[in-house]
């Protein structure tokens, strides 16, 4: 599988011209420019012009003619689907390619959603700041009182839940410690339900 990937990568490089050195990354171009700039600073203007012209001439003379094409690294019958091995490799590569495209699309959608959410949050923050600036001191007092009441009610709810949990826990432990057998307790429950009409 890795050999098929390598072959497809080589074909892609040949198609894009990277194999022949026609394209270079932006970082490589920046590095080359800085190297050229530093080397030309030390030389006089006339010498730098002469060097630039000679470099240009050398590059043109070393480049292959545009009509010649690079020989493909793939075997001639690689895309022949009648060969089972080739067909499987092509299908695997195609599936991997589609999966990569799907992942890229998902990432793009996620980034777009997060960007929209950040913009909405920024807009809400701006609106809240504007609204907060327009409030009078009495309104701040009212908001503070409401906030403190909410905090007190939250504490009360938490304490009530804690007490309820403790009482349930105690009731459960009392039921476990009773001396009645299961049959006696079931019979007493039946009697109680009959008496109370439940």
From Swiss-Prot:
It comes from the Eukaryota. Its main location: nucleus. Residues 37-49, 56-69 have a biased composition (Basic and acidic residues). It comes from Schizosaccharomyces pombe (strain 972 / ATCC 24843). One of its GO terms (cellular component) is nucleus. Residues 176-186 have a biased composition (Low complexity). Residues 187-198 have a biased composition (Acidic residues). Disulfide bonds: none annotated. It is found in: Nucleus. This is Uncharacterized protein C645.12c. Coiled coil: none annotated. Keywords: Nucleus. Residues 15-69, 172-198 are annotated as: Disordered. The lineage of its organism: Eukaryota, Fungi, Dikarya, Ascomycota, Taphrinomycotina. The keyword Nucleus applies.
């Amino acid at each position: 599988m890795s050999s098929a990937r390598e072959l497809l990568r080589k074909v892609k490089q040949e198609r894009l011209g990277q194999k022949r050195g026609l394209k270079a990354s932006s970082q490589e171009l920046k590095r080359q420019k800085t190297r050229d700039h530093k080397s030309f600073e030390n030389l006089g203007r006339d010498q730098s012009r002469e060097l630039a012209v000679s470099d240009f001439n050398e590059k043109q003379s070393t480049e292959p003619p545009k009509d010649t094409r690079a020989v493909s690294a793939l075997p001639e019958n690689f895309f022949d689907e009648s060969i089972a091995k080739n067909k499987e490799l092509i299908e695997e590569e195609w599936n991997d390619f589609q999966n990569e495209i799907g992942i890229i699309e998902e990432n793009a959608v996620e980034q777009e959603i997060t960007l929209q959410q950040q913009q909405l949050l920024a807009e809400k923050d701006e609106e809240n700041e504007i609204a907060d600036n327009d409030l009078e001191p009495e309104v701040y007092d009212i908001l503070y009182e409401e906030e403190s009441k909410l905090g007190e009610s939250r504490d009360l709810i938490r304490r009530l839940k804690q007490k309820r949990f403790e009482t349930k826990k105690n009731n459960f432990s009392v039921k476990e410690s009773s001396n009645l057998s299961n049959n006696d307790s079931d019979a007493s429950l039946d009697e109680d339900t009959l008496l109370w009409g439940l």
